[in-house]
Amino acid sequence: MGSIPNKTKINSSELIWNEENALWYADQYGNHISNELTINSITIDPNDILLDIGCGIGAAVKIAAKRCNNGKVYGIDPIETMIKLAKTDQRKNSNIEFSIGTAEDIPLQNESVNKIISINSIHHWRDYKKGLSEVKRVLISDGLFFISSDIVNNNDCGHGPGPLQTNKDIVKELDIAGFKDITLRNYSLDDEGIHLIRCQKE
């Protein structure tokens, strides 16, 4: 592939996820403000059991773990390099667990978490319908699912062409998959913003 533009906002779905590109992406976006903004925009309780799908180097996981200090936070990512980086800086957080995993095959038991987040990752899922089915499998009844995307390109979510290109598309697919109480709100911090979709398992 061609060279990657240095320090330039790109559509990450265009990347080939080899180790070199994963390291580059982790350096550029691993601690992006969207992680903090997402966690700050949802309610996290001390006893929550939370899963981050596509956790990257674990920035959001580590922020969330400080809030659910009596619970557990799982982070999964299909890229081994990302998980290695996440574990390197994990220190001694006993309520954090990182592992290689995909949205289509979540390595957790049925109804084992009460909240799931996906930050700038749902457009990477190879089979989003299967991924949404897995989300419902591991969520408890009435569990919450949050999908966060950066606000770019004049209020678009910048995912590029595809079935989940716009927030309207994502909301439609969540409805088809059987989620309820679907809402969409925008949040901003330091001139950066996110679209945050919230929905609930039946």
Regions found by a protein language model. Give the residues of each.
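Short glycine-centered segments of the SAM/dcSAM-binding site in methyltransferase folds
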Residues: 49, 143-144
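A short SAM/SAH-binding and catalytic strip from SAM-dependent methyltransferases
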Residues: 115-127
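Conserved class I S-adenosyl-L-methionine
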Residues: 1-43, 59-63, 89, 146-169
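Class I SAM-dependent methyltransferase SAM/SAH-binding core
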Residues: 51-105
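A short acidic, Gly/Pro-enriched loop at the edge of an enzyme's catalytic core
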Residues: 104-115
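Core SAM-dependent methyltransferase catalytic element
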Residues: 186-202
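A short glycine-rich, Lys/Arg-flanked "PGG" loop and its adjoining helix->strand segment in the class I
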Residues: 129-141
